Amino acid sequence: MVELNSSIGASFNLLRKVKALPAYCEIHTDCRLVQLEGHEPFCPKCAKKSIDERNNNVVLEGTWRNYRRAFHGVLRCDSIFDDFELKKATFDNYETEPNTEAAGNLLKARQIAGKYLDRDYKANTIITGAPGVGKSHLAVSMLKAVNKTIQPDASCLFVSVNELMRLIKASFDSKGSEFTEARMVKLLGGVNLLVLDDLGSEASFQSSSREASEWVQQVLFGILNKRNRTLITTNLTSEELAKIYNPKLLSRMYKGIAKQNGVIKFTKATPDKRMVIF
């Protein structure tokens, strides 16, 4: 109460220093100018308008920041990487040699990314091949190109499947975790374009023929059942995927792929870039 009374007293003291002048505002001709001791004369109505505009600008800036966060910010803030170097990946820094399989796959990735700029394009894409050939690099590049160019703006997200499952499992014993199964299924199911990176790794670290757990398949089904625009990278062939996942889940993964020629395949013709060190 003492602070409030002091504040009111200070305001009244300030008001006592304001003098009304005989001159009128050129804009608000019915309003006399006033002057605060030691300051230039001003029009109260002009001052109020200036304050209102400043407040409106603050609100608009906040709204714009929230808008950008809801779309462009999703890729930057909500993506789940297990290799943070992938954040730097673009089409421009994807290294290839002319007339190679990798160069052809780069071109195809650019073309498919262009298709995803059409919101009516409903099909998944699978990028398959051995580890280290650049599958994830291409997927991130495609995602960035769409996120930057699509109109109107749309949310895009990159998620390492293995890391996703680890974080969801950790949430079981962590009250208040943002990585609950329900939240992640909702987030991944709702973005415009999603990358599921390294699909199959969550089941194949121990044995390539090991079936993915029922819980993992339920989580993946919950995500893919809500979607029709997903980029999937995997080290596995369709035959190997069939040993890991049940047919209902596979049908969600392969949605629209055959019709749209949506497979980018790396063979032994493309070497593991991470192994070429000398």
Label the predicted regions:
Residues 103-110, 147-190, 211:
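Short glycine-rich substrate-engagement loop in P-loop NTPases that contacts/grips substrate
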Residues 93-125:
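Pre-Walker A (pre-P-loop) alpha-helix and adjacent loop at the N terminus of AAA/AAA+ ATPase modules
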Residues 1-104, 268-278:
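A short, basic N-terminal segment
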Residues 121-140:
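Walker A/P-loop nucleotide-binding motif
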Residues 155, 190-193, 226-232:
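Loop/turn-to-beta-strand initiation segments
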Residues 141, 145, 222:
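Active-site signature of alpha/beta-hydrolase-fold catalytic machinery across serine-
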